[in-house]
């Protein structure tokens, strides 16, 4: 394992974390929108 390999792995891990974070944020927003629609219907 060279330093370049470790650096590449670090970048990939960061990208995966960002993708996971954006997925979580998007799903949270969708849940909030669904709740708003339900409360508006009542």
From Swiss-Prot:
GO terms for biological process: cell cycle switching, mitotic to meiotic cell cycle; mating type determination; negative regulation of conjugation with zygote; positive regulation of meiotic cell cycle; positive regulation of transcription by RNA polymerase II; regulation of cell cycle switching, mitotic to meiotic cell cycle. It comes from the Eukaryota. Keywords: Cytoplasm, Nucleus. The keyword Isomerase does not apply. It is found in: Cytoplasm; Nucleus. GO terms for cellular component: chromatin; cytoplasm; nucleus; Pi Mi complex. Mating type proteins are sequence specific DNA-binding proteins that act as master switches in yeast differentiation by controlling gene expression in a cell type-specific fashion. Required for meiosis, but plays no role in conjugation. There are three genetic loci for mating type genes in S.pombe, mat1, mat2-P and mat3-M. Cell type is determined by the alternate allele present in mat1, either P (plus) in a h+ or M (minus) in a h- cell. Mat2-P and mat3-M serve as donor of information that is transposed to mat1 during a switch of mating type. This is Mating-type M-specific polypeptide Mi. It comes from Schizosaccharomyces pombe (strain 972 / ATCC 24843) (Fission yeast). The lineage of its organism: Eukaryota, Fungi, Dikarya, Ascomycota, Taphrinomycotina.
């Amino acid at each position: 394992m060279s330093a370049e390999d470790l650096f590449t792995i670090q970048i990939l891990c960061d990208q995966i974390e960002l993708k996971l974070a954006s997925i979580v944020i998007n799903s949270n927003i969708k849940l909030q929108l669904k709740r708003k629609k339900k409360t508006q219907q009542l």
